[in-house]
């Protein structure tokens, strides 16, 4: 089935939130969607994001931290910004691109429980999207 839609998760550094969103997206949406993530900048995958996803048996050690790819951005069926900075400075998307904002707190530099909380919130949001389309 190569008629998959494309979903593109964006945040500032493609380090924490968008990495977790990509992983959850592949788990919940992978049969119907091509799932990608990127950042305004590429800060590298945060080790605590890797650890947090490992706790829920999802391995993201092979995911890479990437800057926004205009080719993916301009052909995505859905672009999801995960932080207000990415929402405001994201390159403009063509009018036919569906772009939504799902805001999540940035756990970087915060205590471990913040990574767990944000991981779970992102997972629940993507699970809801997989079930309802919203």
From Swiss-Prot:
The active site is at residues 11, 83, 90. GO terms for molecular function: arsenate reductase (thioredoxin) activity; protein tyrosine phosphatase activity. Keywords: Arsenical resistance, Cytoplasm, Disulfide bond, Oxidoreductase, Redox-active center. Its EC number is 1.20.4.4. It is found in: Cytoplasm. GO terms for biological process: response to arsenic-containing substance. InterPro entries: Arsenate_reductase_ArsC, Ptyr_pPase, Ptyr_pPase_sf. Catalyzes the reduction of arsenate [As(V)] to arsenite [As(III)]. PANTHER family: ARSENATE REDUCTASE. Belongs to the low molecular weight phosphotyrosine protein phosphatase family. Thioredoxin-coupled ArsC subfamily. This is Arsenate reductase 2. The lineage of its organism: Bacteria, Bacillati, Bacillota, Bacilli, Bacillales.
